[in-house]
């Protein structure tokens, strides 16, 4: 029993909770540094050649579950521990503190007033109804009062005492929601060409719809660096009687029937070439060996003796580079310019077709996350409300009225209110 009590004391301590939060923050940071949820070969190939900090190779990354941190045993165990710590702290400290603050404290003697932050006393007439008058005044000022025969207990801002408990509940909901989301959330990356349609099905809400990419554009800085990707999507559904167009950008997702659609990436998927008066639409693939965001395709050109040429492009506005794979010498081809003669073939670029990279995510934990944030914000705000307490004691023998006050926050503001009340009571 003693061991269990000591264990609860340690788990419910602020130091223990802060240690867990720091550990979770470090683990989350590692999770952003190490790519998550790839196959084992990816980690072996990448981290065997260049171990993390010179220590963690691919095998150790897999063994320590750093390839899926947010669903790993040790990370989820840490979340559970933090939930237990917050719950234990709430039951051991916050709830008893709240219960204690609900009880009315009596100050029956003038000696106790000396322990208060603010005290004052006034002479009174023996026959006056001072207690009733003071009680009425305090109620008009918004104070909750409890009147005894010769003294009054009053308080204001008791809701501030609930704040820390609400924050703890919000954090627990956040942790539970995050753990729930790590197991239940699903995401899919999809590249769409303008005019292409994707079927959306959300089994959790039993809703179906079609989403069509109407238009995709890229905003660039003056130096050509991509600034923003914009997709205009048409949502349609006969069952839902729906037909509307919505726009998604980077950091501006679309939420639709429990699904969230993010603008994540882009690619150049196709080009339209005219080769010797015949139109061809060629599909491109990314070529990381050449550079970042470079797409290309290998084609045969030549009216008599055919040769292989590599076509590469890195911008939706062009140019298209045509390179001889024998010596990698090449020429640039621009949209709708005069045809370029390559190995006796006439080649012209008619169209560059970029595709929009979208991530469709279904995360049932989102309502929990939003609700937890509301609780945390609400709890933090009401925690700032000071809890003020007043005690008034009438001593008919010494013909003196004593008033004392206590505040847990904003003593300067309470001091002004205290002396103003004291002066009003003095004028009775």
UniProtKB/Swiss-Prot annotation:
Q: Does the entry feature the keyword Transcription, yes or no?
A: no
Q: Which UniProt keywords are present, listed alphabetically?
A: Cytochrome c-type biogenesis, Membrane, Thylakoid, Transmembrane, Transmembrane helix
Membrane topology, as annotated: Multi-pass membrane protein
Q: Where in the cell is it found?
A: Cellular thylakoid membrane
Extract the coiled-coil ranges from the record: none
Q: Which GO terms describe its cellular component?
A: plasma membrane-derived thylakoid membrane
Q: Which GO terms describe its biological process?
A: cytochrome complex assembly
Where exactly are the transmembrane stretches of this chain?
14-34, 72-92, 162-182
What the protein does? Answer: Required during biogenesis of c-type cytochromes (cytochrome c6 and cytochrome f) at the step of heme attachment.
Q: Give the protein family.
A: Belongs to the Ccs1/CcsB family.
Description of how the protein assembles with itself and partners? May interact with CcsA.
Protein name, entry field: Cytochrome c biogenesis protein CcsB
